[in-house]
């Protein structure tokens, strides 16, 4: 939905530019990352059916008329159990605190469950403009949607309510227009052609992690991470990427490798295809699997993911 023509940092003579930060808050798998990708028009945040796949703040940028909107995709809000969980939830609330507008995303198909109620309860004291976004509405009957919207607005005074399908784009254009009209006047934060503040090597690692989760959603626990250890632009215009999938135990390494390396090969093929499409370059990807015991307690790993290490 990048429909703008204004230069970054300036204003046209006819139209004053606008810009602002919009945080997306919701329970795991509410569809936050899918919505970010839909509004931006390309992938900047990974999407899987496995919950809690977004770990750090991911900023996607789109332009609507004279407005530049910076979307902050946060980790899902849930009750943390592990150190990594605590870091993710803290990061999510930190992203919301600095935003101009907060989109509260609720999975309409899941209904008014415990996660939705806890999320709404936590939003009562938030001062920023709050917008309720009911997602996956194409899977829910209209009377149920109306009841859900009424209950949510009864708990929290939302400025607006939108009913959308982030997956197929239904309702997203109206949401984009509203955000463009609601962010403050001011110069753009980023160049016109920039769609994310995430370095490409980090996005490439996130894409590989997505393919890892999609392939091994039943078998692989969350104790895994992917790091891009080498990125080389070659003279022929191609890119050589070396990445490592880190797991905590030898048994997990065997799962990721698969029989005769077939599983990691399939993960690499899927990741390479998508990275190549985004870069519009030939990609030579070399994927390794290594054991790094207790990486979930290593402060350096948290810094690499953009998370504060909780003590």
Swiss-Prot record:
Q: How does it sit in the membrane?
A: Peripheral membrane protein
Q: Region G5: what ranges?
A: 164-166
Task: Alphabetically list the UniProt keywords.
Answer: Cell inner membrane, Cell membrane, Cytoplasm, GTP-binding, Membrane, Nucleotide-binding, Ribosome biogenesis, RNA-binding, rRNA-binding
What are the record's GO terms for cellular component?
cytosol; plasma membrane
- The name of this protein is GTPase Era
User: How does the record describe its quaternary structure?
Assistant: Monomer.
Per the record, which residues fall in region G2?
52-56
Q: Which residues form the KH type-2 domain?
A: 216-293
Q: Where in the cell is it found?
A: Cytoplasm; Cell inner membrane
The family assignment reads: Belongs to the TRAFAC class TrmE-Era-EngA-EngB-Septin-like GTPase superfamily. Era GTPase family.
Q: Where is this region: G1?
A: 26-33
Instruction: Just give the chief location class.
Output: cytoplasm
Q: Does the keyword ATP-binding apply?
A: no
Q: Where does GTP bind?
A: 26-33, 73-77, 135-138
Q: Does the record bear Cell inner membrane in its keywords? A: yes
Quote the function comment for this protein.
Answer: An essential GTPase that binds both GDP and GTP, with rapid nucleotide exchange. Plays a role in 16S rRNA processing and 30S ribosomal subunit biogenesis and possibly also in cell cycle regulation and energy metabolism.
Q: Where is this region: G3?
A: 73-76
Please, one GO biological process term? ribosomal small subunit assembly
**UniProt organism field:** Brucella melitensis biotype 1 (strain ATCC 23456 / CCUG 17765 / NCTC 10094 / 16M)
Domain Era-type G: from-to ranges: 18-185
Q: Where is this region: G4?
A: 135-138
């Amino acid at each position: 939905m990048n429909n703008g023509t204004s230069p970054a940092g300036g204003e046209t003579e006819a139209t004053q530019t606008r810009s602002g930060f919009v945080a997306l808050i919701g329970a795991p798998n509410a569809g936050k990352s899918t919505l970010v990708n839909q509004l931006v028009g390309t992938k900047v945040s990974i999407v899987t059916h496995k919950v809690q796949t977004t770990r750090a703040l991911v900023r996607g940028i789109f332009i609507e008329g004279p407005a530049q909107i910076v979307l902050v995709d946060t980790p899902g809000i849930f009750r943390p159990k592990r150190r990594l969980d605590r870091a993710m939830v803290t990061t999510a609330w930190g992203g919301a605190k600095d935003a101009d507008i907060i989109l509260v995303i609720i999975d309409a198909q899941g209904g008014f469950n415990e996660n939705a109620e806890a999320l709404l309860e936590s939003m009562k004291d938030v001062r920023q403009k709050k917008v309720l976004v009911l997602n996956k509405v194409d899977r829910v009957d209209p009377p149920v949607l109306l009841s859900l919207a009424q209950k949510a607005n009864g708990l929290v005074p939302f400025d607006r309510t939108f009913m959308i399908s982030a997956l197929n784009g239904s309702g997203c254009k109206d949401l984009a227009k509203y955000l463009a009209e609601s962010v403050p006047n001011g110069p753009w934060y980023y160049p016109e052609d920039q769609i994310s503040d995430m370095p490409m090597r980090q996005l490439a690692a996130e894409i590989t992690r997505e393919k890892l989760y999609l392939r091994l959603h039943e078998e692989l626990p969350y104790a895994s991470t992917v790091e891009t250890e080498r990125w080389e632009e070659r003279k022929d215009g191609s890119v050589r990427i070396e990445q490592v999938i880190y797991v905590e135990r030898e048994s997990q390494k065997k799962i990721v490798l698969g029989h005769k390396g077939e599983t990691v090969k399939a993960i690499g093929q899927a990741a390479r295809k998508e990275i190549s499409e985004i870069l519009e370059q030939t990609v030579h990807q070399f994927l390794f699997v290594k054991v790094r015991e207790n990486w979930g307690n290593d402060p350096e790993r948290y810094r690499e993911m953009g998370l504060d290490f909780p003590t």
